């Protein structure tokens, strides 16, 4: 009997198992190391291919996705999607608590793009921030698109001159992008205009669905340039709300419009945070018929946009061709105003 028992144990060990005895306790199963999306639980080759095709090709991209998004693109259950996201967050070290002093150090790594105006830069805490959405709204001719053109040039400067050595993605919804204006600003700031134009990638959006699709496609260009000497550091949407405003008319369409706008803004936030880029959007205004005192204008987009934009700046015309920028909302800055001019250099004091 003893011989048979030894034989059974030997056969057990030949299969690659170690018998658990009092002297040799059972070994704990090693936790799987997750380095790519294929390593995530519930992600097989077919699911991984679907995720990659939809742009979810990194742990970070999956970690900041919603279960409903993954469910739709990968054809999986919402429960499986949630487990995949939770595993990605753990592997990418996202969604965990951080001490405030450590968060302050992280904030110190945020880049800033000069607007070309020292007074406006001061108002914004040093310029347009990466990892944030900056919304500028105002009436026609207030300087929104001029500021966008200036930023598209300034971001290409080295950090010591107010830039980030970066490229630009520009989503144009109103046919207002002008390469001639970019050339003029670049020339008057001592830059090679042809080189500046080479690092601006422009797409015209013809409706709100196309606009949202272009934001998704922008991620491909961001990834393509990520490890080059000119990574994308600025994404401009000029204007953010024009298509949504014209396509969804009346109170009956308001809920659907706001849902789509919220999804659009969530996509922009994800790109800003995931790839350390500055998102700059312009917005239109409308008159408030019930306003009897003060400025009767208000930005389009309602509470959805008000809560989604990190910084909100209101532009208006001043005397003598000057423009006045008022910081309406920012989580870390006080309200205030700055005066600037629009010249052949773009925006300046």
From Swiss-Prot:
Biological process terms in GO annotation: DNA recombination; DNA repair
Pfam families from the UniProt entry: HHH_5, Rad51
Protein residues bound to ATP: 138-145
Biased composition (Acidic residues): 7-16
SMART domains in the record: AAA, HhH1
Matches recorded under InterPro entries: AAA+_ATPase (IPR003593), DNA_recomb/repair_Rad51_C (IPR013632), DNA_recomb/repair_RadA (IPR011938), DNA_recomb/repair_RecA-like (IPR016467), DNA_repair_Rad51/TF_NusA_a-hlx (IPR010995), Hlx-hairpin-Hlx_DNA-bd_motif (IPR003583), P-loop_NTPase (IPR027417), RecA_ATP-bd (IPR020588)
SUPFAM superfamilies in alphabetical order: P-loop containing nucleoside triphosphate hydrolases, Rad51 N-terminal domain-like
CDD domains assigned: archRadA
MF GO annotations: ATP binding; ATP hydrolysis activity; ATP-dependent DNA damage sensor activity; damaged DNA binding
Region called Disordered, residue ranges: 1-32
Alphabetical UniProt keywords: ATP-binding, DNA damage, DNA recombination, DNA-binding, Nucleotide-binding
Role summary: Involved in DNA repair and in homologous recombination. Binds and assemble on single-stranded DNA to form a nucleoprotein filament. Hydrolyzes ATP in a ssDNA-dependent manner and promotes DNA strand exchange between homologous DNA molecules.
Homology family: Belongs to the eukaryotic RecA-like protein family.
Protein name, as recorded: DNA repair and recombination protein RadA
């Amino acid at each position: 009997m003893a011989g048979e028992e030894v034989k059974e144990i030997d056969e057990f060990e030949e299969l690659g198992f170690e018998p658990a005895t009092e002297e040799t306790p059972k070994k704990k199963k090693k936790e799987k190391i997750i380095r790519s999306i294929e390593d995530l639980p519930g992600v097989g080759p077919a699911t991984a291919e679907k995720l990659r095709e939809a742009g979810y090709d990194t742990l970070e991209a999956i970690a900041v996705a919603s279960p409903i998004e993954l469910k739709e693109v990968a054809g999986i259950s919402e429960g499986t999607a949630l487990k995949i996201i939770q595993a990605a967050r753990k592997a990418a070290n996202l969604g965990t608590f951080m001490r405030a002093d450590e968060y302050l150090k992280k904030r110190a790594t945020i880049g800033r793009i000069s607007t070309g105006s020292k007074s406006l830069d001061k108002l914004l805490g040093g310029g347009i921030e990466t990892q944030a959405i900056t919304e500028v709204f105002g009436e026609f001719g207030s300087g929104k698109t001029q500021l966008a053109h200036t930023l598209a040039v300034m971001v290409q400067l080295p950090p010591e001159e107010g830039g980030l050595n970066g490229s630009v993605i520009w989503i144009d919804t109103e046919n207002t992008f002008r390469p001639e204006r970019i050339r003029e600003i670049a020339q008057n700031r001592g830059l090679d205009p042809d080189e500046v134009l080479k690092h601006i990638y422009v797409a015209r959006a013809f409706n709100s669905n196309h606009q949202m699709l272009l934001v998704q496609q922008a991620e491909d260009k961001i990834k393509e340039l990520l490890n080059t000497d000119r990574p994308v550091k600025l994404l401009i949407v000029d204007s953010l709300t024009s298509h949504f405003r014209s396509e969804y008319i009346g109170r009956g369409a308001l809920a659907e419009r706001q849902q789509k706008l919220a999804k659009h803004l969530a996509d922009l936030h994800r790109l800003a945070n995931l790839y350390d880029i500055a998102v700059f959007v312009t917005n239109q205004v409308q008159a408030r018929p019930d306003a009897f005192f003060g400025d009767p204008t208000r930005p389009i987009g309602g509470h959805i946009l008000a809560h989604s934009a990190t910084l909100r700046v209101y532009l208006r015309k001043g005397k003598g061709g000057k423009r006045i920028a008022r910081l309406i909302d920012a989580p870390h800055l006080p309200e205030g105003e700055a005066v600037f001019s629009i010249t052949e250099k773009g925006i300046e004091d």
